[in-house]
Regions:
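Short, mixed-charge low-complexity intrinsically disordered segments
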Residues: 48-119
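Structured domain cores in non-transmembrane regions
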Residues: 14-21, 36, 49-55
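A short, exposed loop/beta-hairpin motif centered on an aromatic-Gly-Thr core
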Residues: 24-41
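Short linear motifs at secondary-structure transitions and domain/linker junctions
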Residues: 3-9, 39, 60-68
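Short aromatic-glycine-(Arg/Gly/Cys) micro-motifs in beta-strand/loop hairpins
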Residues: 1-28
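Ordered hydrophobic segments in well-structured contexts
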Residues: 4-9, 30-32, 84-92
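Amphipathic alpha-helical interface segments used for dimerization/assembly
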Residues: 43-47
Length: 119
């Protein structure tokens, strides 16, 4: 069986590393690749684009990254409060989460460097 790689973009009131039961509803874009290098390049390109659009970025596990603007919120009637909206990016191999492409801090630094470089 050949490996397939996916880059998935989400938009949700939960950061992309929280895989709640209905998390797939939050997928807004998905790209599939036959090789790792193309998938990682797309992942980095999308991270750079998101980092230019949204001033806040946080990495956690599974090479998931959340981007957000503090003004993008939705009101939750059930909790009677505003919820922050997040734009997430995640990398998968054979429909499994990838734990490490690089170290998370190294990845975050690379994204910031690429974002500044292409301006």
């Amino acid at each position: 069986m050949e490996n397939t790689w996916k880059v998935i973009m989400t938009h949700s009131d939960a950061e992309p590393w929280w895989f709640f039961e209905d998390w797939k509803r939050d997928i807004v874009k998905e790209w599939e690749f036959d090789n790792k290098s193309e998938a990682v390049r797309k992942y980095l390109d999308e991270c750079v684009a998101l980092s230019r659009e949204f001033p806040n970025m946080k990495t956690k596990k599974y090479n998931s990254i959340a981007f957000w603007n503090e003004n993008e919120v939705v009101f939750c009637e059930a909790c009677d409060d505003d919820l922050q909206m997040y734009h997430g990016i995640i990398l998968f191999e054979n429909d499994h989460l990838i734990e490490n492409v690089d170290t998370l801090e190294g990845l975050k630094e690379e994204i910031q460097s690429l974002a500044n470089e292409k301006l």
